[in-house]
Regions:
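Short, low-complexity disordered leader/linker segments with a strong preference
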Residues: 1-42, 348
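Early extracytoplasmic/lumenal segment of secretory-pathway proteins
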Residues: 35-104
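Extracytoplasmic ligand-binding site segments that recognize negatively charged/polar headgroups
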Residues: 46-54, 89-229
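A ligand-binding cleft/hinge motif common to bilobed small-molecule-binding domains
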Residues: 100-104, 226, 231-250
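Short beta-strand->loop
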Residues: 111-118, 133-134, 162, 249-261, ...
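Periplasmic-binding protein-like
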Residues: 139, 168-176, 203-208, 214-215, 249-271, 286-309
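A bilobed periplasmic-binding-protein/Venus flytrap-type ligand-binding module shared by bacterial periplasmic
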Residues: 144-149, 263-275, 286, 294
Length: 348
């Protein structure tokens, strides 16, 4: 009889221990950290015009439910900011600005590789082979003119880089600072690629004597010409188109007929982005037909990289412009060296 009771007691004890251990296991599972929720907010550094930036942010939020906090900066400023924040990124995406700067950022380990499925339809020459950045638009480099100045002085518009060196244009030219504005750097790189480094720097030194001001932002020279502050602004033609659309009837456009360069505006994810999944969604969305067509309805008139997207009619006037074989990879790889050489050339 005692043996039976001992067996029963042992069974109860074992059962209690089993329940106890099961309970402990259950408590451990309950304490496991919950899966990280996908962010519903993202910070984006934008290099497009303010109006376009606002609409891009608004439309992305409508389509995905993710709010965009954006900071508008020039390409050079954005690159400097991302460098400064390398160990503690404050933004997840870089949207807009010349690919030259993106290539430099990739070289410095500042970008995250991501091959969006929507990038498959975009031409290889418009994207990084490793997925670090993808092109979203093209802008042709040219001259934005104050027509009143040319009429008053009975002058012909410049149609070559050499025309800018004429005496009548001394102190009448504005361009972006190559160090802060990616547009300004494209001018430097384009001249060097067209003329060779030695002759190119000689030309830029001569051009420097004609320049009234180097602006912080690359689009500012167009506004200077529209306001009559300078006869010529060196920048992208779409900046001039925007001013004409805004009612600046004095603005005229021309470009170097021997061949001009173009920017390839890009989008990329910043290394160690604080909102990685939202960043991938933004890149996917930025490459769509809808996203790329937003600009032409909001003061941006660039050519587009998505073959399904319709380019703005206003830009088609320049679709047959002669382009140089602008090497973005070389330009990005040599950015620091060329800027140093340019600084030296203009100070001599």
């Amino acid at each position: 009889m005692k043996s039976i009771w001992k067996k029963a007691a042992l069974a109860v004890l074992v059962g209690a221990m089993a329940v106890s251990f099961t309970g402990c296991g259950g408590e451990k599972k309950a304490e496991a950290p919950a899966a990280k929720k996908e962010s519903k907010e993202i910070t984006v550094y934008m290099g497009v015009v303010e109006q376009s930036a606002k609409v891009v942010a608004s439309e992305f939020e409508k389509d995905t439910g993710i709010k965009v906090n954006f900071v508008r900066m020039s390409g050079g400023e954005t690159l400097s900011r991302i460098r400064a924040e390398k160990n503690n990124p404050q933004a997840s995406v870089w949207y807009g600005g010349s690919a030259d700067s993106f290539i430099m950022a990739k070289k410095e380990g500042l970008l995250e590789a991501y091959k969006s499925p929507n990038a498959e339809k975009i031409k290889p020459e418009f994207k990084d082979a490793d997925g670090y950045w993808t092109g979203i638009y093209q802008g042709y480099l040219g001259f934005i003119l104050d027509g009143r100045y040319f009429d008053e002085h009975k002058l012909q518009p410049p149609t070559s880089w050499d025309d800018l060196l004429k005496p009548e244009f001394t102190g009448q030219i504005v361009m972006g600072n190559p160090g802060s504005a990616s547009t300004g750097y494209v001018v430097v790189s384009a001249i060097v690629q067209s003329m060779g480094e030695e002759k190119g720097m000689e030309y830029l030194a001569k051009l420097n004597k004609q320049v009234k001001q180097y602006t912080k932002a690359g689009a500012a020279p167009a506004r200077s010409a529209a306001l009559g502050e300078a006869a010529i602004g060196i920048t992208y033609l779409h900046n001039g188109i925007r001013l004409i659309k805004e009612g600046n009837t004095n603005v005229r456009l021309s470009l170097p007929e021997e061949g001009t360069a173009y920017e390839l505006g890009a989008v990329a994810i910043i290394k160690n982005a604080p909102d990685m999944e939202a960043a991938k969604k933004f890149v996917d969305w930025a490459l769509t037909k809808k996203a790329q067509e937003i600009g032409q309805h909001n003061n941006s008139y660039q050519f587009l990289t998505n073959p399904e997207a319709n380019p703005p009619e206003e830009a088609m006037k320049f679709k047959d412009a002669k382009l140089i074989d602008y090497n973005f990879q070389w330009s990005g790889d040599n950015r620091a060296r060329l800027l140093e050489a340019w600084n030296k050339a203009v100070k001599e």
